[in-house]
């Protein structure tokens, strides 16, 4: 006896998910709404490949301990390393540099697509996820940063998120640079330590002031026993940084005054403060002063930011996995990155942009009851009552008539009998089925069964004999009335 062939085990790679039709529709609807806002600001769509040469992407990910610096990579036939993009910003920098001579400057573009990170997966943390970005490349004025912030606010409101439910938090990397200058951490030789400090501050929302203090010092031991090595700063060196992230006040003016007291005597820090003041004037003149808040604790975790940085934060409570109320938190962020395009050119190219975390934003809309869910309805199903080729062609003609009238429909193409076909139509969420056997064909008639109305009536009729005799929600019409009859059923259920 031959050995039974072993079947391949069905499994999904960790960190990846499948998406259903309903999820995809909700996602497409949300993205289309955001695109409308981006288009209204004069941005145009761009698509770049999911693969780029590894050296083009650069090494900017925070998870540097993972293989290949946190990216998925392979070699092509020329033995050049290529990697799946980890964000949409690095590919934009490559595209702009490659098409520098023909693109308008400043260049406004938006992109949406999947990005990939070779990171340890966990709850809510995936290796493939979608981002939605908008950037202005070629503008050095902070008016561009201000416009990006205002556009982020408008995008959230376009999705139905109310003003009291969100805030755009804003700061400037130059202010942090001023603090680091005060404690002697300027210069290329201190770059790695500055990056560790940056990522420690970026954990403020998650770990609080004490957690940041530990990460600035020797390190932090979490509840699971994992130890994260810190920046190794002394208490004296840590204090100016801790003061910086805690000086936020009720008004922008008060916060800016507090910042001047900390870094106002450094050239870099004062430059960052003046940029925030200029942006605040733009917000006030355009009615955004209550939606965009200066918050010095915002730094962003990637090290290519060079100026204003911002995050979109949702302020309402949700239940976490332990059933505790927590603030939903960030659903996107961005900032100025004047050095990224310059990697490819001799001249500096200023740029600023914003990235939406699509999955988190979709979860937020679901919690608010604003997730754009289409009323579930499948296609009208024409049943296969006779499998003779001549009759199959006849059934297909019915389907084509419905499709030409704009009605989503399909011909059942399985091998099952009438009972199983009806069950199939139920599983497809069909609003109705079209039935034509030999007797109906001879009379030039078709039966149409309204499955939605039938389900409702079946709950009211308890007697099987009454059910069979009444044949609820089932009508007989002439063949030439098929389209009209189906349309009337769809209109009655508000599907047309």
UniProtKB/Swiss-Prot annotation:
**What is the recorded name of this protein?**
Histidine--tRNA ligase
What's a Pfam family this protein contains?
A: tRNA-synt_His
What GO CC annotations are associated with the protein?
A: cytoplasm
EC class name: ligase
Carries keyword Calcium?
A: no
Single GO molecular function: histidine-tRNA ligase activity
User: By its UniProt entry, which InterPro entries does this protein fall under?
Assistant: aa-tRNA-synth_II (IPR006195), aa-tRNA-synth_II/BPL/LPL (IPR045864), Anticodon-bd (IPR004154), Anticodon-bd_dom_sf (IPR036621), His-tRNA-ligase (IPR015807), HisRS-like_core (IPR041715), HisRS/HisZ (IPR004516), HisRS_anticodon (IPR033656)
Q: Which UniProt keywords apply?
A: Aminoacyl-tRNA synthetase, ATP-binding, Cytoplasm, Ligase, Nucleotide-binding, Protein biosynthesis
Subunit field text: Homodimer.
Tell me which EC number(s) this protein carries. 6.1.1.21
Is this entry keyworded rRNA-binding?
A: no
Catalysed reaction(s) here are:
tRNA(His) + L-histidine + ATP = L-histidyl-tRNA(His) + AMP + diphosphate + H(+)
A single Gene Ontology biological process assigned to it is: histidyl-tRNA aminoacylation
Q: Which CDD domains match?
A: HisRS-like_core, HisRS_anticodon
The organism's place on the tree of life at top rank: Bacteria
What family does the Swiss-Prot or TrEMBL record give for this protein? Answer: Belongs to the class-II aminoacyl-tRNA synthetase family.
Its subcellular locations are: Cytoplasm
